[in-house]
Amino acid sequence: MKKVFLILILFLSCYIIYNNTLDNKMYYLTIGDFLSKGTNEYGISSYGYSDFIKDYLYKTKKLKEYNKTFTDNDYRISDIVRILEYNESKNNETLNRLIKKADIITISLGMNDLYYKLDNNQKIYTYIDNMLLDYDKILNYINKFHHNEVFILGYYNTSGQDNDIFEYANYNLKKTCDKYKFTYINLSDIFNNNPKYFSKSNNFTPNIKGYEKISQIIVEKIKNN
């Protein structure tokens, strides 16, 4: 009888340890445009900031699962709004379900929207206001569920012009992030007019050093959480 009891205690102890280890691991979801997809300056899907974050979580034995299904070079904010509203699926997964599962979320959206509008920047501040109202819909949905961390990437300007437009967009994006207590990642201080992180001129896609720099900023915040 004692032997059976000891075996039962041992089994329960192992089960509790296993469960605690599993509970400490995190489901990492990244959403968004070319930055979250990890597209390099040559237009090829390569190693992005989210892949470096995934590597950190894996090496520190904190990674449960990593998902970048809902990333695409051409995604705009309105695309993600539509995907959520209509519960659209991709590769047999829905973003709605993935958001509910995620412990850590990183999002990069709006760069495509901004650079598209720069060629015709009439009423651009109204355009940005409407763009961020749509972004708010996404963040409001995410906020309904518990997450350890949500990181939102800000905007940067590689053109050397229209800085006031990017400052306005970043200021209001940060206000939206603060509203939900999500972490805003300031990229403009690092990337604006910094050729170190861009291998091709007239191209706002960072090189591998740029992606690694983004990941370092986010990883540092994860460590300090």
Language-model regions, residue ranges each:
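N-terminal secretory targeting modules
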Residues: M1-I31, L35-I44, K54-Y66, N96-L98, ...
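Structural recognition of the beta-strand scaffold that forms the well-ordered cores
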Residues: Y28-I31, S36, N67-T71, D103-S108, ...
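A short, flexible beta-alpha/helix-coil linker loop
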Residues: L35-K37, N112-L114, N157-S159, F198
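Conserved SGNH/GDSL esterase-like catalytic core that processes O-acyl groups on lipids
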Residues: K37-Y125, N130
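Extracytoplasmic/secreted proteins, especially bacterial periplasmic and envelope-associated proteins
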Residues: G48, F52, D79, R97, ...
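Sec-exported extracytoplasmic/periplasmic mature domains
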Residues: K54, Y58-K59, E85, G110, ...
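Active-site segments of SGNH/GDSL-like serine hydrolases
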Residues: S108-N112, L139-Y168
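Catalytic His-Asp segment of secreted/periplasmic serine-dependent ester chemistry enzymes
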Residues: Y155-N225
